């Protein structure tokens, strides 16, 4: 969403919903306070490095592709353990599309992935705060922005830019954050050819990756500079089921 569509009151309400009342009440940049929040019997934070977390996602997608899909642990014991707290090893920004369920694509169950989903996999204030919480409070070492083949939101943004479609006001506002990626994709398409929509989907992912990497909030900038956090892009092929990672920095 653009700044104009987010009033301070609405931004605050969405931030509280995303982070929880206790976390949202902390001052911005309170890394230590978030990181040292009492666990209350919660599982320990992941010990994976960013590269190890990425390798686990890749391995999970390989199993998904090979029909060797491990059964997720949905037992009562697992549920009760997670009731005490969460310790995901990766955060994902994904599209709201019903065909793109991150847990299935990467063969994971409850409590393994911290997922933020919006149509078009962009990040607004609530999403940004949610991701910051996953890094600072939960110790996530990896954020992956996942776009996907034939994304309806990016397609709508592309048609809006090319003048081939008009959208209702609420949908126009929804795709506004995607429009700069479409403009960049148009320039690439003019010189390189190929499918404009596919280019726009990739550029949209790269724009969000850049947005997160260049955030001035210390909850992102500090772990990035220390090598404790990595932010990468990915593209999910609906036809093959394969997730291609790119823009790894």
Residue ranges and their predicted role:
Residues 2, 50, 102-197, 201, ...:
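Short HxH-centered metal-ligating active-site micro-motif
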Residues 2-21:
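N-terminal secretory signal peptides and thylakoid transit peptides that target proteins
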Residues 28-66, 70-74:
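C-terminal segment of N-terminal export signals and the immediately downstream linker at the start
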Residues 57, 92, 145, 233, ...:
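Divalent metal-coordination and catalytic microenvironments
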Residues 60, 95-97, 118-119, 148, ...:
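Fold-independent oxyanion-binding glycine-rich loops
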Residues 70-128:
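Conserved beta-strand-loop surface patch within small alpha/beta domains used
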Residues 188-230:
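Charged, glycine-interspersed solvent-exposed loop segments at helix/strand-loop junctions
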Residues 223-245:
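GST superfamily/GST-like fold recognition
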């Amino acid at each position: 969403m653009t700044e104009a569509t987010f009033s301070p009151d609405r931004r605050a309400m969405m931030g509280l919903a995303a982070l929880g009342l206790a976390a949202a009440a902390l001052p911005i940049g309170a890394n230590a306070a978030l990181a040292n929040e009492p666990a209350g019997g919660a599982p320990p934070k992941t010990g994976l490095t960013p590269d190890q977390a990425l390798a686990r996602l890749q391995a999970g997608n390989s199993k998904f592709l090979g029909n060797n899909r491990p059964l997720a642990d949905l037992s009562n014991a697992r549920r009760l353990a997670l009731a005490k707290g969460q310790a995901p090893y990766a955060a994902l920004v994904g599209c709201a599309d019903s065909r793109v369920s991150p847990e299935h694509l990467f063969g994971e169950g409850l409590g393994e992935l911290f997922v933020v989903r919006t149509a078009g996999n962009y990040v607004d204030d609530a999403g940004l705060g949610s991701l910051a919480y996953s890094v600072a409070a939960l110790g996530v070492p990896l954020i992956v922005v996942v776009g996907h083949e034939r994304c309806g939101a990016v397609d709508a943004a592309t048609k809006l830019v090319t003048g081939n479609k008009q959208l209702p006001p609420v949908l126009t506002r929804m795709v506004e954050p995607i429009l700069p990626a479409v403009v960049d994709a148009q320039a690439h398409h003019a010189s390189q050819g190929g499918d404009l929509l596919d280019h726009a989907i990739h550029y949209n992912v790269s724009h969000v990756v850049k947005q997160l990497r260049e955030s001035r909030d210390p909850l992102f900038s500090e772990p990035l500079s220390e090598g404790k956090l990595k932010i990468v892009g990915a593209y999910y092929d609906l036809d093959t089921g394969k997730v291609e990672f790119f823009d790894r920095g």
